[in-house]
Regions:
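Small-residue-biased structural context
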Residues: 5-139
């Protein structure tokens, strides 16, 4: 398994989604871990406590706030990415309420949130991390 070590592979964060920005990667790792444990919970207990879902959304909101702070500190443009965060939180909260109303299956919800998060990192966070790294290099 030497080849696997080429890119820092952590527990839940796929190597392809490592951004190189430690603060972000640590939080991404934590969020993937939470999603994973919710998937396990959903299968083992055949239920998904609503407070767990709200906790996950709160965790994402905190993570978004961290990224926004990193952008401000580095003076990196964040408008579109920030708008995406606002839109994402609105959609995720809507999905949670559909889950609560029984309109949405919990397994579908967890697959959706995991897929969405992977896409968001690939489409937004990797580019953002690269811009942060650039900004750090520039005096």
């Amino acid at each position: 398994g030497d080849r696997v070590m080429a890119k820092k592979q952590t527990g839940f964060l796929p190597a392809a989604l490592v951004t190189g920005e430690t603060k972000m990667d640590v939080q991404h790792e934590d969020i993937f871990g939470r999603i994973e444990s919710l998937k396990n919970l959903a299968f083992e207990t055949n239920s998904l406590p609503v407070q767990e879902m709200h906790a996950l959304i709160d965790c994402l909101a905190e993570h978004f706030a961290t990224e926004e702070r990193l952008a401000q500190e580095a003076k990196v443009e964040f408008l579109v990415h920030g708008q995406e965060h606002v839109r994402n939180l609105r959609l995720l909260k809507k999905a949670v309420s559909e889950l609560e109303n029984g309109k949405l299956d919990r397994h579908t919800f967890l697959r959706y949130i995991e897929y969405w998060f992977e896409q968001h990192i690939a489409d937004f966070d990797k580019r953002f991390a690269a811009r942060l790294a650039e900004a750090k290099k520039t005096p």
